[in-house]
Amino acid sequence: MLYFIPTPIGNLSDVSLHILEVLAKCEVIFCEDTRVTKKFLNLLQTRYSLKLKDVSFYSLHSHNEDEILKNIDLSIFKKICAYMSDAGMPCISDPGNSLVKFAQKNKVEYEVLSGSNALILAAVASGLVEKEFSFLGFLPNKGDERKVAIQNALNLPYPVIIYESPKRILNLIKTISGLDPQRKIFIIKEATKKFETKYFDKAINLAQILENENLNGEFCLVIDKSKNTKFETILESDILDLDIPPKPKSKLLSKITGINQKKIYKNLIK
């Protein structure tokens, strides 16, 4: 049996009784970082008197998951196993997706526990999400790839939720302000933590507000939907026409087509 266990994104009290019950019977824990997970479990033992079995820990993250899953002995899942990312819900801008696919392919019984998730928290707190929305995770870091992603996000006819780092949050808001100054944006910083802060305003105003704010922390944004009934989406042909190197071009094409990036890259450099 395999459990996917969400961990608090800032407030230890968000741990559910169900999570504690599952952890108490776990025999194997796969985790993004064993040091972070062991520290978290120590906190649970102190605060909630959690009693753990003699647990075996295995590091499983984006850099080693292919190798680990290729060589893993399926008999390990006869034990009570769990996967935990460092903070938040596994698979949501965090590792874990490959393990889900592995479980499906190999008929390993699994269950996802409910818990902390900045994406859903921001969606509810924003007041902008009623039904459909798009979650983009973290945008590309720089260059034309980032510009294309931002423009596409602003063109969508439903709210868009984005994670952003403290280093790039102001740049993102200024870029949006330059493209659509009246666009409403909700921002939550350090969700569920002691210094949680919320902002809600037009992009042009937020660009000025954030200039004078302490921007340390983790950010989640909800961008209001496009008010245009006619909107342009960047097509595959538009990306092919961009004067950018093959690598970022292959990333963009992979995102909009779903085709493997390496395959696209090989075709581009032929």
Q: Residue ranges of each PLM-predicted region?
A:
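Conserved helicase motor
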Residues: 58-66, 139-142
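Class I SAM-dependent methyltransferase SAM-binding "motif I" and its flanking Rossmann-like core
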Residues: 98-156
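Short active-site oxyanion
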Residues: 23-29, 108-110, 159-160
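Short amphipathic alpha-helix with an adjacent loop that forms part of the alpha/beta core around
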Residues: 68-77, 152, 207-212
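Glycine-rich, flexible N-terminal cofactor/catalytic loop recognition
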Residues: 1-62
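Glycine/small-residue-rich loop that forms an oxyanion/phosphate-binding "nest" at active or ligand-binding sites
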Residues: 68-117
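Alpha-helix capping/helix-boundary segments
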Residues: 35-37, 118, 168
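A contiguous loop/helix-start segment that scaffolds small-molecule binding in enzyme catalytic cores
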Residues: 2, 55-56, 79-80, 159, ...
